[in-house]
């Protein structure tokens, strides 16, 4: 950390620690901000040693400035930190970050006006060429030397190392495209080819990329046909598709086309072709469709949003279609818990409001809250049911009857009539109704227990099933007579009157 923190020492460090992060804020710049900035520069394949001088900070600011429009919040913070550091090296006193940015912008405007005035003092074509060169003198990798000439600065090994590491780790995932766009900002076709040739693996993907470049080069030749006739001395020829791809053009020709008046940005055109090919390769390496991205039942909404937008970056569609996918599929493919919350927010909710509302959904606290709400609803419903049963029953109200006087509308304990003596059931004295042994009745109003030995709610006389008579053939009649005799004999018990009187002539 000592090497990183040695960017500022002495009085410069004291002035650095007096600068506020925000206008009117309490927090100020500290040593840790310098350490963080050096680490971020290494991550962006830049040399942290340039932070030790004013010229180095100027180079870093020129390299980071083109990516500010599409850069992240971390990139803007890095640019602001370098702007304050540039003011410290330039002995410009500033109070906060906003003042430092204003000083940097003012200085940049003065330098640009000086460059334009110097270029306007030159004569003829040299004046036009110098003014065109001054307009892009800050663009990497073309820099202006002390003699005012545009020279090419080769791509650094740090940039190549960062590019190769991204390809090896990400394997053409959607984030490879913005990384290539950032590393190749302002590069010439020769620099872009150097970056592509540095990729050792994934040769199948590189072949697909080469086919896309050839198709775009053929389309360029069709839309930009060459003019017939000889080329004037000192005039550059018009670039063909193969010249833009860097296969049939030299480095000096590429610099000449880029710095011509009007310029032909062959590097930007070639980068656009490569990005088209990378989009095709990313779609090949990431076959997952945005329609298949669904939130799991226990997946946090933040992770689901990250997966959704990562897949959305790989989708080859217009911005209008992507906006429709975001507005529709992001809510439609969420889990039921988050979907209920998102629908309650309405269609005009922002992503920040969605993530804030769905924060913690699926976790232990959310489950406990849902369980508590469900139990509260059940308890409230139970209280309402009990109140309904006690207060206002669904059926007709039962009339009460007094056992003492026999009138309705009051109970016996509230009866004002004289107390009736004896049992209220049988009318006899000597016992109460609860001890009455009189005849009881069942729910049918009949005596209990039944005298017939069978409860009164059973059928007393059961009819036997009948069948058609059987045809008689003689021997069946004999069997019937025998059965009849057996039946008659079974009616009498073993000890009958016949055995008492012996041979009774009337019984024969």
Curated annotation (Swiss-Prot):
Pfam families: Gag_p17 (PF00540), Gag_p24 (PF00607), Gag_p24_C (PF19317), Gag_p6 (PF08705), zf-CCHC (PF00098). One of its GO terms (molecular function) is structural molecule activity. GO terms for biological process: viral budding via host ESCRT complex; viral translational frameshifting. The record marks 140-141, 371-372, 387-388, 442-443, 458-459 as: Cleavage. Signal peptide: none annotated. A lipid is attached at residue 2 (N-myristoyl glycine). Residues 104-133, 446-508 are annotated as: Disordered. The keyword Zinc applies. Residues 492-508 have a biased composition (Polar residues). Capsid protein p24 is phosphorylated. Specific enzymatic cleavages by the viral protease yield mature proteins. The polyprotein is cleaved during and after budding, this process is termed maturation. A motif (Nuclear export signal) lies at residues 16-22. GO terms for cellular component: host cell cytoplasm; host cell nucleus; host cell plasma membrane; membrane; viral nucleocapsid. A motif (PTAP/PSAP motif) lies at residues 465-468. Keywords: Capsid protein, Host cell membrane, Host cytoplasm, Host membrane, Host nucleus, Host-virus interaction, Lipoprotein, Membrane, Metal-binding, Myristate, Phosphoprotein, Repeat, RNA-binding, Viral budding, Viral budding via the host ESCRT complexes, Viral nucleoprotein, Viral release from host cell, Virion, Zinc, Zinc-finger. The keyword Zinc-finger applies. A zinc finger (CCHC-type) spans 400-417, 421-438. Residues 104-113, 477-488 have a biased composition (Basic and acidic residues). A motif (Nuclear localization signal) lies at residues 26-32. A motif (LYPX(n)L motif) lies at residues 491-500. Matrix protein p17 targets Gag and Gag-Pol polyproteins to the plasma membrane via a multipartite membrane binding signal, that includes its myristoylated N-terminus. Also mediates nuclear localization of the preintegration complex. Implicated in the release from host cell mediated by Vpu. Capsid protein p24 forms the conical core of the virus that encapsulates the genomic RNA-nucleocapsid complex. Late-budding domains (L domains) are short sequence motifs essential for viral particle budding. They recruit proteins of the host ESCRT machinery (Endosomal Sorting Complex Required for Transport) or ESCRT-associated proteins. p6-gag contains one L domain: a PTAP/PSAP motif, which interacts with the UEV domain of TSG101. PANTHER family: ENDOGENOUS RETROVIRUS GROUP K MEMBER 24 GAG POLYPROTEIN-RELATED (PTHR40389), PTHR40389:SF4. Belongs to the primate lentivirus group gag polyprotein family. This is Gag polyprotein.
